[in-house]
């Protein structure tokens, strides 16, 4: 065995040769397995089992092969890791020869996949975190692509192969076991199909641009917090067939154009149309200026506290900051159109938002709890979306201008009333006859302005009017008023029916002068008008409530129709796919028959 030959053409060397004399071929430290104290199994890699262990008083990850069939992947990863040295690539400490295993840097944060889609509780993360992860991934891959004398292609980029350290702020690429055995490993790997470039599974010649395609899918995934092509389901070949036919993840609502353009370029069917990883690094580095806070550690729901609400908004992404330092004057019931001043994680489940809206703090911050909403505009209505997808709705404006959008919004006329982010506010007539914007769920009819609350009146709600209206409590007097009815023994005014005391202060009938017939007539007319006014307001409130019920029913009907239409389209699509596959099968069958006949002819002539 020639060491020089093995070093110059390591890819052609046998696995046995390289294991027998790795110190002569590869640049790594040989570690005595007795120095390692294995603690627990933490997962699987491209080959073998990954365990957490202690080595020389520090945490390490050891990757052991389980069978001889994994030995080649082990050699590939050992060879590739011994070549690289980059802050965004997992570090190789050394290898053991008996038993065969790699000793690598331990990532306490686990994989990016588990952070995005793992078991509850899931951490909150901001758009800054999402962009930073993608930037670091691109930096690591760009380093691999720039290696000399021959570029190294990862070929299996996906969140399970991206590890997080330093509180989730630093990303490291791992699993190089597929770097030279793409056909035997990846085409049979269901877990990689969603991120795989079409030219890889099509059997075409591929270059480092296949990593660019995978990176574009990862960018979509960290922004939406959804699994790519999850709605397709079935075996891996269904995803491959869809990607082959041009299917890509749905575009993201409110995603800034520079990010969308970069992402869709990475998805291009033609590898030559995709940007290089070096170009991606330049673009992402430029865009990161608009995403501060990426160095803040990830926060989990159990770490959340009300006391730290105002300080954790920008670092944890646990709520949308409506009244932040730059937009303290912004407050509108239609919050869909209010750009947030920090990069938070937006949870869009409307029912949860409605419950949260009732628990607003007086500081003006709207706390959004974790939900399972999706930021993808064109996803099926019945799909179970992932949690806390990155809110990109206001980044485009910040990219276009370095100063944040600060146009004043119309505020509420009632303090501590915020409306609902996803609901269109209703115009409700207040007691003084002026329109007032309220959220749909808040069906209060009127209310005095702050500072106008009197000892006799308060802001009544529909419920108060319904249960204490003029027809059920004290109706307007129809008989002539007499001085005997004007006051009780304590001198309090009993001339005004109690129902009218729920009216706004300036609308309540005033006690008449008992010695003036004109005053008495005005008072009685005022009482009748007040009664009619209350009836109309009550009817308006009830009609509004009924309207909301009808709107809800209509929405449900539309959802049912959409579901039916979606199922019909999906059925048609499956039929077309079945027909296409059948045609393809027949073509392959004919080709096979032709090949067999040609072989038979050759055998006959020979």
Swiss-Prot record:
Membrane topology: Peripheral membrane protein
Ranges of biased composition (kind: Polar residues): 306-338, 443-452, 464-473
PTM remark: Association with TAB1/MAP3K7IP1 promotes autophosphorylation at Ser-192 and subsequent activation. Association with TAB2/MAP3K7IP2, itself associated with free unanchored Lys-63 polyubiquitin chain, promotes autophosphorylation and subsequent activation of MAP3K7. Dephosphorylation at Ser-192 by PPM1B/PP2CB and at Thr-187 by PP2A and PPP6C leads to inactivation.
Modified residues ((Microbial infection) O-acetylthreonine): 184, 187, 341, 444, 446, 448, 467
Sequence positions bearing Phosphothreonine: 184, 187
Activity regulation details: Activated by pro-inflammatory cytokines and in response to physical and chemical stresses, including osmotic stress, oxidative stress, arsenic and ultraviolet light irradiation. Activated by 'Lys-63'-linked polyubiquitination and by autophosphorylation. Association with TAB1/MAP3K7IP1 and TAB2/MAP3K7IP2 promotes activation through autophosphorylation, whereas PPM1B/PP2CB, PP2A and PPP6C dephosphorylation leads to inactivation. Ceramides are also able to activate MAP3K7/TAK1.
Ranges where the Protein kinase domain occurs: 36-291
Main location: cytoplasm
Organs and tissues of expression: Isoform 1A is the most abundant in ovary, skeletal muscle, spleen and blood mononuclear cells. Isoform 1B is highly expressed in brain, kidney and small intestine. Isoform 1C is the major form in prostate. Isoform 1D is the less abundant form.
Biased composition (Low complexity): 361-375, 453-463
UniProt feature coiled coil, ranges: none
Chain positions found as Phosphoserine: 192, 367, 389, 439, 455
Gene Ontology cellular component annotations, sorted alphabetically: ATAC complex; cytoplasm; cytosol; endoplasmic reticulum membrane; endosome membrane; nucleus; plasma membrane
Known EC number: 2.7.11.25
Signal peptide: none
Cross-link named Glycyl lysine isopeptide (Lys-Gly) (interchain with G-Cter in ubiquitin), sites: 72, 158, 209
Primary enzyme class: transferase
SMART domains cross-referenced by the UniProt entry: S_TKc
CDD domains: STKc_TAK1 (cd14058)
UniProt cross-references to SUPFAM superfamilies, sorted A to Z: Protein kinase-like (PK-like)
Chain residue ranges for the region called Disordered: 301-338, 354-391, 443-493
Gene Ontology terms: biological process: anoikis; canonical NF-kappaB signal transduction; cellular response to angiotensin; cellular response to hypoxia; cellular response to tumor necrosis factor; cytoplasmic pattern recognition receptor signaling pathway; defense response to bacterium; Fc-epsilon receptor signaling pathway
Function: Serine/threonine kinase which acts as an essential component of the MAP kinase signal transduction pathway. Plays an important role in the cascades of cellular responses evoked by changes in the environment. Mediates signal transduction of TRAF6, various cytokines including interleukin-1 (IL-1), transforming growth factor-beta (TGFB), TGFB-related factors like BMP2 and BMP4, toll-like receptors (TLR), tumor necrosis factor receptor CD40 and B-cell receptor (BCR).
PANTHER family, alphabetized: MITOGEN-ACTIVATED PROTEIN KINASE KINASE KINASE 7
The protein's name: Mitogen-activated protein kinase kinase kinase 7
């Amino acid at each position: 065995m020639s060491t020089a030959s093995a070093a110059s053409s390591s890819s052609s060397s046998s696995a046995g040769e390289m294991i027998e004399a790795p110190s002569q071929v590869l640049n790594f430290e040989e570690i005595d397995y007795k120095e390692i104290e294995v603690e627990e199994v933490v997962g699987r890699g491209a080959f073998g089992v990954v365990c957490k262990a202690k080595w020389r008083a520090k945490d390490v990850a050891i990757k052991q092969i389980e069978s001889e069939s994994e030995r080649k992947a082990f050699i590939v990863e050992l060879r590739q890791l011994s070549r690289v040295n980059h802050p965004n690539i997992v570090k190789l400490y050394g290898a053991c020869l008996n038993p065969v295993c790699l000793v690598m840097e331990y990532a306490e944060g686990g994989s990016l996949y588990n952070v995005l889609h793992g078991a509850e509780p899931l951490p909150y993360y901001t758009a800054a975190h999402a962009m930073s992860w993608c930037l670091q991934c691109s930096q690591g891959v760009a380093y691999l692509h720039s290696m000399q004398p021959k570029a190294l292609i990862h070929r299996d980029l996906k969140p399970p192969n991206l590890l997080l350290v330093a509180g989730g702020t630093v990303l490291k690429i791992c699993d190089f076991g597929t770097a030279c055995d793409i056909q035997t490993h990846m085409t049979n790997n269901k877990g990689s199909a969603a991120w795989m470039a079409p030219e890889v599974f099509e059997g075409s010649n591929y270059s480092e641009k296949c990593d660019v395609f995978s990176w574009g899918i990862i960018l979509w995934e960290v922004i939406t917090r959804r699994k790519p092509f999850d709605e397709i389901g079935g075996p891996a070949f269904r995803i491959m067939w869809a990607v082959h036919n041009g299917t890509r993840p749905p575009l993201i609502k409110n995603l800034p154009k520079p990010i969308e353009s970069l992402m869709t370029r990475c998805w291009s069917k033609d590898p030559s149309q995709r940007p290089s990883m070096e170009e991606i690094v330049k673009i992402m580095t430029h865009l990161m200026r608009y995403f501060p806070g990426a160095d803040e550690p990830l926060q989990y729901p159990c770490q959340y506290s009300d006391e730290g609400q105002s300080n954790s908004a920008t670092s944890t992404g646990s709520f949308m900051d409506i009244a932040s330092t730059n937009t303290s004057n912004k407050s509108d019931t239609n919050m869909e159109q209010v750009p947030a001043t920090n990069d938070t994680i937006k949870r869009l489940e409307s029912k949860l938002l409605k419950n949260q809206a009732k628990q607003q703090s007086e500081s003006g911050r709207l706390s959004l709890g974790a939900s399972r909403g999706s930021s993808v505009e064109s996803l099926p209505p019945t799909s179970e979306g992932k949690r806390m997808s990155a809110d990109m709705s206001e980044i485009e404006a910040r990219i276009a201008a370095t100063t944040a959008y600060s146009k004043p919004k119309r505020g509420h006329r009632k303090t501590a009333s915020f409306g609902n982010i996803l609901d269109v506010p209703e115009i409700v007539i207040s007691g003084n006859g002026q329109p007032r914007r309220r959220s749909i769920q808040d069906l209060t009819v009127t209310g005095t302005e702050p500072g106008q609350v009197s000892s006799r009146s308060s802001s009544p709600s529909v419920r108060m009017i319904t249960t204490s209206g003029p027809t059920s409590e004290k109706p307007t007097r129809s008989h002539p008023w007499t001085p005997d009815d004007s006051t009780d023994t304590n001198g309090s005014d009993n001339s005004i029916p109690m129902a009218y005391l729920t009216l706004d202060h300036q609308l309540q009938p005033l006690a008449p002068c008992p010695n003036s017939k004109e005053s008495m007539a005005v008072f009685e007319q005022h009482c009748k008008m007040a009664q009619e006014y209350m009836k109309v307001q009550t009817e308006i409130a009830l009609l509004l409530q009924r309207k909301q019920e009808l709107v809800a029913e209509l929405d449900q009907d539309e959802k049912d129709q959409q579901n039916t239409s979606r199922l019909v389209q999906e059925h048609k699509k499956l039929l077309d796919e079945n027909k296409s596959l059948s045609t393809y099968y027949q073509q392959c069958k004919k080709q096979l028959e032709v090949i067999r006949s040609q072989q038979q002819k050759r055998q006959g002539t020979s």
